[in-house]
Amino acid sequence: MLYHLLYPLHTHISFFNVFQYITFRTIYASLTAFLICFLLGPFTIRTLARMQIGQYIRELGPQSHQGKAGTPTMGGLLIVFSVLVACLLWADLTNRYIWVTLAALAGFTTIGFIDDYLMQIKKRNKGLSARAKFLAQTVLAAGICLLIFAASDTNTVLLVPFFKRVAPDLGLFYIVLGVFVIVGTSNAVNLTDGLDGLVTGPLVISFVAYMVFAYVAGNAIISNYLQVIHVPGSGEVTVFCGAMAGGLMGFLWFNAYPAQIFMGDVGSLSLGGALGTVAIITKQEILLTLVGGLFVVETLSVIFQVGFFKATKGRRIFRMAPLHHHFELKGWAEPKIIVRFWIIAIALALIAVSTLKIR
């Protein structure tokens, strides 16, 4: 909105020329989202507590988590609100990718909201059935992919990190890949959200990494130099990623250990879905497994645990899955697990960004 209102004035007042720069608008989108979460955080916590919207703890989870019962949840709505406002203020609203990312965010927010709402009604840690949730996510992800590929300049080539000459064209199968990436990321982030601030930090790191990828993909000169796929218009997604990172940092102020508020499924499902959507738009789908390596490992720990348990009729690989619960039961303090996982996320993101130059 500010871009459309103020940038046209640059012919009269040269200062407003700064609104043409994506970097400038990304910085202020990030600050806007951060301030919204930071300033509205206490009000949100009080409101959720007054409405008795508290976290229900999984009965089979670690006993140490029982003390978290009743902590205000569904705080992800605050993050989504901050991102929406920041994008409406600072993004180019004529850019189709901004609306695709916001649509993905809104769609997965709706699924997460219904899931959390049902938990509050049932008064237990059980919302939508796994089948209903997966079906809703798949339909939504397919719609998002169709929106992305509706553009005439859409590229269905898959960029393979480290190999500049390996770029298979998947054709229509790319939509299947896109659905898998979006739904998989949404659920992986949801599984990782099990400790205070555990998923918030890596999400900040992931969106900062994709700020770089979006800017590079949207710039014809830089993308050609680095030999990555140029996606016209995708540079504006940098503003969206900046808003995401800022909103998450503002939320982390209250979500850090000991958490005063949880994001709930309305947060984890929506933010994961948005991250997967950004990966598709920027043509960095494979790198998401590295940037979000922590989410991948947490998800695989659950898959291996369940598979091994069924195959061996009761034996386990880990003391408990997802992986962070395994370390809890080994006696690691919660803050230590969180910080160490953050360190791993930072290292993985740095390696991922470095692949832009390693080809």
UniProtKB/Swiss-Prot annotation:
Give the membrane topology, semicolon-separated if more than one: Multi-pass membrane protein
Identify the enzyme class: transferase
Required co-factor?
Mg(2+)
Query: Might you give the EC number(s) for this enzyme?
Result: 2.7.8.13
The record's subcellular location field reads: Cell inner membrane
Q: Which coarse location class applies to the principal site listed for this UniProt protein? A: membrane
Q: Transmembrane ranges?
A: 21-41, 73-93, 98-118, 143-163, 166-186, 202-222, 237-257, 261-281, 286-306, 336-356
User: Which pathway does the UniProt entry assign to this protein?
Assistant: Cell wall biogenesis; peptidoglycan biosynthesis
List the GO terms this entry assigns under cellular component, sorted alphabetically. plasma membrane
**UniProtKB keywords:** Cell cycle, Cell division, Cell inner membrane, Cell membrane, Cell shape, Cell wall biogenesis/degradation, Magnesium, Membrane, Metal-binding, Peptidoglycan synthesis, Transferase, Transmembrane, Transmembrane helix
- What does the record give as the reaction this protein catalyses? UDP-N-acetyl-alpha-D-muramoyl-L-alanyl-gamma-D-glutamyl-meso-2,6-diaminopimeloyl-D-alanyl-D-alanine + di-trans,octa-cis-undecaprenyl phosphate = di-trans,octa-cis-undecaprenyl diphospho-N-acetyl-alpha-D-muramoyl-L-alanyl-D-glutamyl-meso-2,6-diaminopimeloyl-D-alanyl-D-alanine + UMP
Give one GO term, molecular function aspect: metal ion binding
Q: InterPro entries, alphabetically?
A: Glycosyl_transferase_4, PNAcMuramoyl-5peptid_Trfase, PNAcMuramoyl-5peptid_Trfase_CS
- Gene Ontology terms describing biological process: cell division; cell wall organization; peptidoglycan biosynthetic process; regulation of cell shape
Write down the CDD domains for this protein, in alphabetical order: GT_MraY (cd06852)
Q: Could you say which protein family the record assigns here? A: Belongs to the glycosyltransferase 4 family. MraY subfamily.
Q: Provide the function of this protein.
A: Catalyzes the initial step of the lipid cycle reactions in the biosynthesis of the cell wall peptidoglycan: transfers peptidoglycan precursor phospho-MurNAc-pentapeptide from UDP-MurNAc-pentapeptide onto the lipid carrier undecaprenyl phosphate, yielding undecaprenyl-pyrophosphoryl-MurNAc-pentapeptide, known as lipid I.
UniProt cross-references to NCBIfam families, sorted A to Z: mraY (TIGR00445)
Can you say what this protein is called?
Phospho-N-acetylmuramoyl-pentapeptide-transferase
User: What gene name is given for the protein in this entry?
Assistant: mraY
